[in-house]
Amino acid sequence: MLNRTIAKRTLATAAQAERTLPKKYGGRFTVTLIPGDGVGKEITDSVRTIFEAENIPIDWETINIKQTDHKEGVYEAVESLKRNKIGLKGLWHTPADQTGHGSLNVALRKQLDIYANVALFKSLKGVKTRIPDIDLIVIRENTEGEFSGLEHESVPGVVESLKVMTRPKTERIARFAFDFAKKYNRKSVTAVHKANIMKLGDGLFRNIITEIGQKEYPDIDVSSIIVDNASMQAVAKPHQFDVLVTPSMYGTILGNIGAALIGGPGLVAGANFGRDYAVFEPGSRHVGLDIKGQNVANPTAMILSSTLMLNHLGLNEYATRISKAVHETIAEGKHTTRDIGGSSSTTDFTNEIINKLSTM
């Protein structure tokens, strides 16, 4: 009975993945491109330049929306993604002041039900870090938890914020995490929670991850850890973790720790998946407002995210070539950006990648 259940679920997952893939028109894919705020245009321009040099069969539908456009501005991006099914995206800045609007990033994910965020934290040769050989994946639920956006001021000076956790969405992210681990030969999945305090909400999350792991994925080790301890352990002994699956807020916290471990936010590739749509973006949430327009941003995270997109589209050879060129450029160390110890501009780094591609 269990094997039959797993088979049915696997077939359903495969069918969903098939629906996610966009269609080719004239042998080419159309991809929604959302540069976003901060250094978004500079790092997406880097990707466009590399793709053009490689003659990759992709056309861009560019949606220029800024954080100042408020949630109404997300409509254009949503409609474009509904047409194209796939996107490459920078980050929108979310103001922290009380008068600011809600997150456009969250609004986009919720409207399209892009429920799974994947961030890849892997050490790169040539980048000096405190701890070598990091290889960690953080998968977080994108559409509920603390990021449900449900809060109000009941009376002046008293604010209530609601954290929503549901069984269906937790089961969905659990199976996504275990399927991902299985596909990429990962040995363990760890649920991150705060069930010692939020016994119902985080208790539900922890229990469902554990239950599904034990019943449906016996070949993958499943465990759980309180988020405070997870943060400490990630800094002290990161190699003990393989795949971490988290509610929304904990994933952003651990993601920043992961970025610090491998050398900074400019190195973290990421992606977001839903039933019908996939959006690829840097895995660490840093907009770079302070260096906007200076041509010093590290485009590695965006470039590597674009290679994940190419693999998703079945353009694996292009993805492999570009990824190899990026890794060789960083390992060589002669044309790297200042965040990882170099002095090259975004443009110089991009051009060196293209030079390496031309000799492959």
UniProtKB/Swiss-Prot annotation:
**Which GO biological process annotations does it have?**
glutamate biosynthetic process; isocitrate metabolic process; tricarboxylic acid cycle
Q: Which residues bind substrate?
A: 109, 140, 228
Chief site of localization? mitochondrion
Q: What's in the keyword line of the UniProt record?
A: Allosteric enzyme, Magnesium, Manganese, Metal-binding, Mitochondrion, NAD, Oxidoreductase, RNA-binding, Transit peptide, Tricarboxylic acid cycle
- Does the record bear Oxidoreductase in its keywords? yes
Q: How does it assemble?
A: Octamer of two non-identical subunits IDH1 and IDH2.
| Function comment | Performs an essential role in the oxidative function of the citric acid cycle. Also binds RNA; specifically to the 5'-untranslated leaders of mitochondrial mRNAs.
Q: Supply the name of the protein.
A: Isocitrate dehydrogenase [NAD] subunit 1, mitochondrial
Q: Which organism is it from?
A: Saccharomyces cerevisiae (strain ATCC 204508 / S288c) (Baker's yeast)
Q: Which gene encodes it?
A: IDH1
